[in-house]
């Protein structure tokens, strides 16, 4: 999984501030080409899947892919086996039927290799420009924005599921009305729609799980849940609750790692000390960028409860909390094995490129992981 950003020679905890960065259109496009090349490399190294993200208007250079489905089509043309996922399509920022059409096209053109990854969004600059609002379940001041975002997401996903799976469909909700009444068509009126194309291969749907309501909803829908940036104690609680809700909803117990995916930032070097030195600038740049959006709320505070909003963790804290896996190949392998023992992890998404890293560095990381770490789990 890559954020997909521009190379930076000044990443780290100090200046410049994220909002003070600005990159040229040529630098942004060069990063886009390097992302595609990295996907091709992943296929050659034997990785199962390659995940892109969706972000908009990021002149700061951290995440320069606005449409992972479109870029995924290019990757599909240049690969034969690699599965292509979106982590995540921000559903409320799309017209749901356009998202369904585009996903079905990618899935079919790739021979069934696309993975539908969905999320609700985190960035107001993107959300409010593209037709939705962003709130926070645990912030009373934003509760109404959160409610509206969830309503929009829920209805959009109902539309998408109908469109992808039913030959004919209609949907009439509070937010979406498809087809709206009174559309004339050759002497009659339109009362149902058919998506063209529809998927001709089975597909998976995965959603980021970052709040209690989402934890209750995703397994009821029958999708996979993606867990990231949480202390293992919180991850285990959520992981187990996901399984409980799944069994309640579907009458079947999941295997320990089934329908759940763990995401971990990772960095491998010849020695532990070297790994720490190499990853620190990207780690610190990442939290300088993401901390204000509340991404560190899954860290554990000194009282054993979730960390206070706005925490900017240091690298040692991220390592101690087992949220970042850093060290030699043996160190990282042992930490992955620890998570397999704790959770039964079978779906592991690795994040080997920190903000600002060079694509030469990520090529090295992917090679080390594929050669020195992952074979022990095959």
Model features per residue range: what roles?
Residues 1, 50-52, 83-86, 114-118, ...:
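Hydrophobic faces of well-ordered beta-strands that scaffold small-molecule active sites
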Residues 1-81, 203:
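N-terminal beta1-alpha1-beta2 module of alpha/beta enzyme domains
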Residues 1-23, 137-195, 234-345:
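An alpha-helical appendage that flanks or caps ligand/catalytic pockets
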Residues 17-33, 89-97, 199-210, 266-269, ...:
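Active-site mouth loops of central-metabolism enzymes
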Residues 42, 46, 54, 75, ...:
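Conserved, mostly hydrophobic/aromatic
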Residues 43-44, 73-80, 103, 107-113, ...:
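Acidic (Asp/Glu)-rich catalytic clusters
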Residues 62-86, 152, 367-378:
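Alpha-helix-loop-beta-strand connector modules within alpha/beta enzyme cores
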Residues 208-234, 238:
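A conserved active-site cap/scaffold subdomain adjacent to cofactor or substrate pockets
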């Amino acid at each position: 999984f890559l954020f997909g950003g521009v190379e930076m020679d000044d990443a780290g905890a100090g200046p410049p501030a994220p909002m003070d960065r600005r990159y040229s259109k040529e630098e942004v496009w060069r990063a886009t080409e390097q992302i595609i090349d990295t996907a091709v490399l992943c296929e050659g190294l034997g990785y199962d899947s390659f995940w892109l993200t969706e972000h908009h208007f990021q002149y700061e250079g951290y995440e320069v892919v606005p449409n992972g489905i479109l870029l995924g089509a290019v990757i599909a043309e240049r690969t034969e086996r690699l599965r292509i996922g979106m982590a995540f399509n921000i559903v409320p920022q799309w017209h749901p039927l356009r998202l369904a059409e585009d996903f079905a096209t990618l899935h079919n053109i790739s021979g069934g290799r696309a993975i539908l990854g969905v999320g609700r969004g985190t960035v107001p600059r993107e959300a409010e420009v593209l037709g939705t609002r962003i709130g926070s379940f645990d912030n009373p001041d934003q509760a109404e924005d959160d409610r509206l975002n969830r309503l929009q997401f829920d209805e959009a996903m109902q539309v998408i599921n109908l469109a992808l799976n039913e030959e004919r469909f209609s949907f009439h909700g509070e937010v979406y009305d498809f087809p709206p009444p009174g559309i004339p068509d050759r002497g009659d009126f339109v009362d149902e729609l058919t998506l063209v194309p529809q998927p001709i291969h089975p597909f998976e749907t995965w959603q980021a799980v970052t709040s209690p309501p989402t934890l209750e909803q995703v397994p009821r829908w029958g999708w996979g849940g993606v867990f990231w940036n949480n202390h293992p104690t919180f991850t285990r609680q959520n992981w187990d609750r996901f399984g409980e809700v799944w069994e309640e909803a579907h009458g079947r117990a999941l295997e320990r790692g089934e329908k759940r995916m763990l995401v971990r930032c990772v960095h491998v070097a010849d020695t532990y000390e070297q790994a720490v030195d190499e990853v620190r600038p990207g780690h610190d740049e990442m939290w300088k960028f993401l901390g204000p959006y509340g991404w560190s709320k899954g860290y554990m505070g000194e009282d054993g409860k979730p960390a206070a909003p706005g925490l900017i963790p240091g690298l040692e804290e991220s390592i101690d909390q087992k949220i970042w896996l850093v060290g030699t190949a043996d160190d990282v392998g042992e930490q992955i094995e620890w998570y397999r023992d704790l959770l039964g992890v079978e779906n592991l998404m690795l994040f080997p490129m920190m903000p600002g890293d060079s694509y030469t560095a990520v090529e090295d990381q992917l090679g080390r992981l594929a050669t020195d770490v992952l074979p022990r789990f095959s």
